[in-house]
Amino acid sequence: TNRDIQFTSFNGKDYPLCFLDEKTPLLFQWFERNPARFGKNDIPIINTEKNPYLNNIIKAATIEKERLIGIFVDGDFFPGQKDAFSKLEYDYENIKVIYRNDIDFSMYDKKLSEIYMENISKQESMPEEKRDCHLLQLLKKELSDIQEGNDSLIKSYLLDKGHGWADFYRNMAMLKAGQLFLEADKVGCYDLSTNSGCIYLDADMIITEKLGGIYIPDGIAVHVERIDGRASMENGIIAVDRNNHPALLAGLEIMHTKFDADPYSDGVCNGIRKHFNYSLNEDYNSFCDFIEFKHDNIIMNTSQ
């Protein structure tokens, strides 16, 4: 019944508090640019005393037995490392290792040439005194540098194995949300619905007890970092109640229009701002309070 729906408001507008039940899958991510730094038959995820990331994930899986725990991975892994991942899945049957390579993200792609050409024509349509000639030259050079077979936004993030690689594909995975588990074709995922939500956690977020059901505003919430009283949205936690959440689609739209878009600040933060019509004259700290994923049973950011 509608009466049961709770609302929260930001800037005078009401938003439903959407419910993530206690079976909503959790997703961790490990994109490894140098698998050779691990043993050839070891799980290629850092697990030191200082940064026990693998243990944190295993701990989450043992506490949250009713949930599926995805580990979204990418890297040139050795066969023995892949076997070690399979053994991990065997030892903890709710852990599902999802290889980036096994998932089709093409529905979120756009040709790089289109992004550059749109930006070039935007510049060229301006009166000459308003044009940024330096930028125009740069865009034309970038356009001519696109290699055949690589005219693709999603492929461009595979070439650079930096932060953008992990951040961009994290956004792609969260657009798929629960569907990611179905597409990975893993045993035991079939009772997920195709539009199921998902909660992404960085591997330095430690779960201490079951999270239970969680309410999030309009179906999305993210981690908020507070330093000296200043808040900022972070992508260390992203929770959505469905696939193709409109806030993440708004972020993707920015990635599709800006030639120098950033997957974290544009793909997540600016997409969320746009979705909730946040404008710069509003109090950013109170917006962060509104969108924050808060939970007493998660110790946040332990690797600081």
Language-model features: where?
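Glycosyltransferase-associated regions of secretory-pathway enzymes
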Residues: 1-168, 194-304
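Short beta-strand-to-loop acidic/aromatic patch adjacent to the donor-nucleotide binding site
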Residues: 180-189, 197-204
